[in-house]
Design a protein with these regions (language model features):
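Extended serine/threonine-enriched, polar tracts that run as long, contiguous segments within proteins
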Residues: 101-167
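OB-fold ssDNA-binding interfaces and closely related basic DNA-contact patches used
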Residues: 1-113
Length: 168
């Protein structure tokens, strides 16, 4: 897995507090997206402020290094943009979504919602399943993406969102 920070594209709509994050691939720009195989779901689903999250546990350092390279590129590119826009005078740090665990690393992921409905594909044994029926301690293959970042309390924030989950 390789990531080129020079392909990060940042769009901003006047009056919004969010920066749209895209990755230039040929003639098109798409969300930064990648797959994590065989990740553990140690805690099941968490709910915070009416938002739903799943913490993944990953043992393979390759995934963490890839995420860290994305975070470093995003931090640098967005800091430059925020400086150009006059919103900051010094570089700002990106709030990572990765933290160390006993067995590897935790990655906090968000279950995307649109109009009070979950916007994610969840499959088990070839059949669609409700994301709310996920058990803690299970395993799955996740496709994650980033779509927006924002500045809050002097830090850059973002969330990995789940595009697709195939339970093992």
């Amino acid at each position: 897995m390789s990531f080129d920070k020079d392909k990060i594209v940042i769009d901003y709509e006047e009056g919004s507090s969010f920066y749209k994050i895209r990755y230039k691939e040929g003639a098109r720009n798409s969300k930064i997206m990648f797959e994590i195989d065989h990740a553990r779901i140690p805690f099941g689903i968490d709910i915070e402020y009416e938002q739903y999250y799943i913490t993944l546990e990953v043992r393979e350092k390759e995934y963490i290094n890839y995420i860290k390279s994305i975070e470093a590129g995003l931090e640098e590119t967005l800091s430059d943009r925020l400086f150009e826009d006059g919103l900051i005078t010094d570089d700002v740090k990106l709030q990572t979504q990765v933290r160390k665990s006993k067995g590897g690393y935790y990655i906090k992921t968000k279950i995307p919602q649109f109009k009070d409905r979950f916007n994610v594909t969840c499959i088990e044994d070839g059949y669609h399943k409700s994301i709310l029926d996920i058990d803690k301690g299970g395993w799955g293959t996740f496709v994650l993406y980033i779509d927006y970042a924002w500045l809050r309390d002097g830090s850059i924030h973002y969330k990995w969102k789940i595009h697709r989950l195939e339970l093992e």
